[in-house]
Amino acid sequence: MGYTNVSILLGLLMVFVTPMVFADDVTPIPEGKPQVAQWFNANVGPLAQRKGLDPALVAAEAAPRIINVNPKGGEFKTLTDAIKSVPAGNTKRVIIKMAPGEYKEKVTIDRNKPFITLMGQPNAMPVITYDGTAAKYGTVDSASLIILSDYFMAVNIVVKNTAPAPDGKTKGAQALSMRISGNFAAFYNCKFYGFQDTICDDTGNHFFKDCYVEGTFDFIFGSGTSMYLGTQLHVVGDGIRVIAAHAGKSAEEKSGYSFVHCKVTGTGGGIYLGRAWMSHPKVVYAYTEMTSVVNPTGWQENKTPAHDKTVFYGEYKCSGPGSHKAKRVPFTQDIDDKEANRFLSLGYIQGSKWLLPPPAL
């Protein structure tokens, strides 16, 4: 057999042995941090190695459009103008590469513009910043970045709301950093800064990996179904401070927040992991490091006693001085392996259908 034929045969063999796999919606995130990257790579592979993704997503990823934004001059000088260039009813991935710098804009991505990616550089992350408040825009519309569309992704982006911290006296002082109301959204290595109501994790399936979220009160709130993996939750300010205010309203709702391999840090002490904003919140912390800033009771007492029987607050194999359970409120769920696995696998956010890694550009 000649060299040419051998080369062709080897090439064909490489094509046929390239793994094509379904992302596993069942395998839980491992307890050991060193194994998390392996789990992610095995279950959130690139498009070429995947089966079972939504057909619309597969079609959208076939020929991505890349556009550049630079405040100092480029294809677009503002992020708003770049987003305006995406047609309504968009059907293909649009990757907006953001140059380093500060973008003083109030940005909204409408529902009819799916498949948008905002991408910055990891060592010089662009900053989207605005100072909107509830008094001027209403709470959920005060965000510096509002995403209403599906299949959104953000990579290496900082989002801030620079409005002053609420003083307890000024009406309408809530000021969101971001509101995510679209379905199937992923955030990789992003940072969100605010005080009260930093992130409105509103509705839909969402995935946050290696992110940083800073705030004071209810700084992750809404009715989303979201997994936060390897994310730092940093609490600032003083007074009553609460991380999560999930807005579950009934036992039938499948939404909730899952914090996995996260780290709770902050200033002062007495921080609550969550509170019952509505009757049926669902919040789980797994493999999470809790520093001494966490209140020994863990969760805020319910103002409505009946909610003691309807909240679902789970803790699973967490660590650190803030994780001690001796003084936890009685409605804390010390969940077992079977129960925990629901919140530790991609099935919780339907990840096998839509979750992709950051683009390799």
UniProtKB/Swiss-Prot annotation:
Phenotype seen when the gene is deleted: After germination, the pollen tube is sunted, curved and has an irregular morphology. No effect on the morphology of ungerminated pollen grains, on the efficiency of pollen germination, fertilization or seed production.
The protein's Enzyme Commission number: 3.1.1.11
Localisation: Endoplasmic reticulum; Golgi apparatus; Secreted, Cell wall
GO cellular-component term (any): pollen tube
Tissue-wise expression: Expressed in mature pollen grains in the anthers and on the stigma. Found in pollen tubes within the style. Located at the tip and in the shank of the pollen tube.
Signal peptide bounds: 1-23
Residues holding substrate: 174, 275, 277
Active site: 197, 218
Main location: endoplasmic reticulum
Record field: catalytic activity: [(1->4)-alpha-D-galacturonosyl methyl ester](n) + n H2O = [(1->4)-alpha-D-galacturonosyl](n) + n methanol + n H(+)
Site entry (Transition state stabilizer), positions: 196
Keywords linked to the UniProt accession: Aspartyl esterase, Cell wall, Cell wall biogenesis/degradation, Endoplasmic reticulum, Golgi apparatus, Hydrolase, Secreted, Signal
Note: The pectin methylesterase activity is inhibited by PMEI2.
Oligomeric form and interacting partners: Interacts with PMEI2, and in vitro with PMEI1.
Biological role: Acts in the modification of cell walls via demethylesterification of cell wall pectin. Involved in the pollen tube growth and determination of pollen tube morphology.
PANTHER family to which the protein is assigned, alphabetical: ACYL-COA THIOESTER HYDROLASE YBHC-RELATED, PECTINESTERASE PPME1-RELATED
UniProt-recorded name of the protein: Pectinesterase PPME1
Biological source species: Arabidopsis thaliana (Mouse-ear cress)
